[in-house]
Every structure is written in C-alpha cells, then in structure tokens.
Regions:
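Phosphate-coordination/substrate-recognition cap region in phosphate-metabolizing enzymes
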Residues: 1-60
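Hydrophobic, Leu/Ile/Phe/Ala-enriched alpha-helical segments that form helix-helix packing faces
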Residues: 8-20, 82-94, 115, 119, ...
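Acidic, low-complexity terminal tails and accessory targeting/binding regions
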Residues: 18, 22, 33-48, 96-101, ...
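General structural signal for secondary-structure boundaries
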Residues: 48-55, 70-81, 144, 154
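Extended, charge-rich low-complexity interaction segments
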Residues: 55-78, 160-165
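A mid-sequence, solvent-exposed acidic-amphipathic segment
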Residues: 65-102
Length: 165
C-alpha cells in the first residue's frame, strides 16, 4: 500500500486517541484487498492511465471493457472481492466482546472510483474522489448496506456479491 494511505490511517487513530473517544485503538496494518490488487500488469496500467484523461476516465474505460484483462482483472470481480473482505470484517467478532467496533479501511482513489461505479453508488463521471472521501458498509434491520458519502446506497445482496464468483 501507498505510504500516504498508511499515514492517513495513523492520523485517524491519533485523532481518535487525542479526542479520548474511548474504545479499542488498533494499529495500522496493510490489507492487500484495499490496495490496487486488481492491477495485473502495473506498467501497462500506469501507461494506460497516463494516456487517459485522468483516473475517473481510466476507470470508466476499464468498466467499458477497453482495458485488457491482462492489465486489470474484470472490474466486477474486483468489486466483489473488496465487498467480500468488507463483509467479512463487518461480521467478525469485536476485538473486545460486547463493545462496538469500527474498522477504518484506507484505500486508493482508484478503488473508491471502482467501488462506487461497480456497486451502483455513483458513476465515475460523478463526484471526484477527494482526500478523506469514504464508503461505508453497515447492517440495519438484518440487511447489509453499502453507501457513499454522496448519497448512493445499495443493499449488499446475492446479486451484488455474485460479482465475486
């Protein structure tokens, strides 16, 4: 993962500790599923990105099937894989039994664009990804939802999770 992503996670933990918000403060650790794991040929990906009209445009090309699968895996598969990891974290027992827990996962701008487009939250032509933009997975009324700070919300159901298979 990019150093600045790790630094962002550390800053969030430091701010929470300084505010004395309570709870368990864990350390920053790398989880490959929040990196750009879907890039199968980094050199060709960066060359394609450099020739595009920016990151959102490149992600749009990827979803339109204009980026070879030898460069980037199918975007739907990447979306499904990230959702699987997030769902597993949501369903995992709390570090301290009986206490609420929040997992803060920092990722790359490309993954935010990918998840918003692929899950149907917002198209890549929608809001740009900015520092500290976020996505949220939560449970309400025995259903799991995936949401964007820009207002898009989808239920994490079998159809959406089917991308991972």
């Amino acid at each position: 993962p990019v150093t600045r992503c790790r630094d962002t996670g550390a800053l969030a933990i430091e701010a929470s500790t300084a505010a004395q918000r309570g709870g368990v403060i864990s350390k920053v650790r790398d989880i490959e599923a929040f990196g750009v794991f879907y890039a199968l040929d980094q050199i060709r990906m960066w060359k394609g990105l450099h020739k595009s009209n920016g990151l959102a445009d490149y992600v749009g090309q990827w979803f339109a099937g204009k980026v070879p699968q030898s460069v980037l895996m199918r975007p739907q598969r990447a979306v499904g894989m990230v959702l699987e990891v997030m769902l597993d974290k949501l369903n995992a027992p709390a570090i301290e039994a009986g206490t609420p827990q929040l997992d803060l996962c920092v990722t790359h701008d490309m993954t935010i664009f990918t998840m918003r487009q692929g899950a149907g939250l917002e198209p890549v032509t929608g809001p740009d990804v900015r520092f500290m933009d976020g996505l949220l997975m939560y449970e309400r009324d025995n259903k799991v939802f995936f949401a964007s700070q820009h207002g898009g919300i989808v239920e994490v159901d079998d159809a959406l999770m089917g991308y991972a298979r």
